């Protein structure tokens, strides 16, 4: 059994200025104000439409992100219906195969400290689940049948593609203090990364949500 930390990877090449210019070009059609486009007008225009709540314009650019997280967190991610997803399938992935190292991979729980009794109980439970999974496969079960005993903390990979408007909605929900701690564990660093690469778009998301997990 392998234990790893969750992480994200932005797969879409991001040029912040080019993104703002693209959004401005689309948005100015509404007002037929294309003549006001300059080399420096995009940031002000985009900030203005966000302030006015005209966020439909932000739907003209998509970003794809790869999430490596546990199955429980993935269930929260895919609730965002205005997005497209591909996810590692426990129906077809047979973790007894060499390609998976003949072991399951689980996500380290952020709420448990390594070496404590809670950590040890969790680790034993995961190993028992792995053992039961392999025994079911040996007995003749298919991966989609044997997966019934796999833990919620099983590592999964999710590809999420969403437009900028939906990413704003995602971050407002998933970085909030009320969000699940393991959801915040991946969402907050991702928000920081997007803010650093795409100016203006995420600047108004409350600073209180940026606390370190």
Residue ranges and their predicted role:
Residues 1-213:
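Family-specific signature for flavin-dependent thymidylate synthase
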């Amino acid at each position: 059994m392998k234990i790893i930390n969750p992480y994200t990877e932005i797969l879409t090449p991001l040029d912040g200025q080019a993104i703002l210019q693209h959004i401005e070009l689309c948005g100015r059609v509404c007002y037929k104000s294309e003549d006001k486009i300059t080399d420096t007008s995009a940031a002000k225009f985009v900030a203005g439409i966000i302030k006015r709540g005209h966020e439909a314009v932000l739907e003209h650019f998509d970003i794809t992100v790869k999430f490596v997280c546990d199955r429980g967190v993935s269930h929260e991610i895919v609730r965002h219906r205005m997005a497209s997803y591909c996810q590692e399938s426990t129906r077809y992935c047979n973790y007894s195969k060499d390609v998976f190292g003949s072991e399951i991979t689980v996500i380290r729980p952020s709420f448990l400290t390594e070496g404590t009794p809670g950590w040890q109980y969790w680790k034993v439970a995961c190993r028992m689940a792995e053992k039961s999974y392999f025994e079911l496969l040996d007995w003749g079960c298919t991966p989609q049948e044997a997966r019934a005993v796999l833990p919620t903390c099983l590592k999964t990979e999710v590809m999420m593609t969403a437009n900028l408007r939906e990413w704003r909605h995602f971050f407002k929900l998933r970085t909030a203090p009320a969000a699940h701690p393991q959801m915040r564990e991946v969402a907050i660093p991702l928000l920081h990364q997007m803010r650093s690469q795409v100016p203006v778009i995420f600047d108004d998301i409350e600073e209180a949500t940026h606390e370190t997990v």
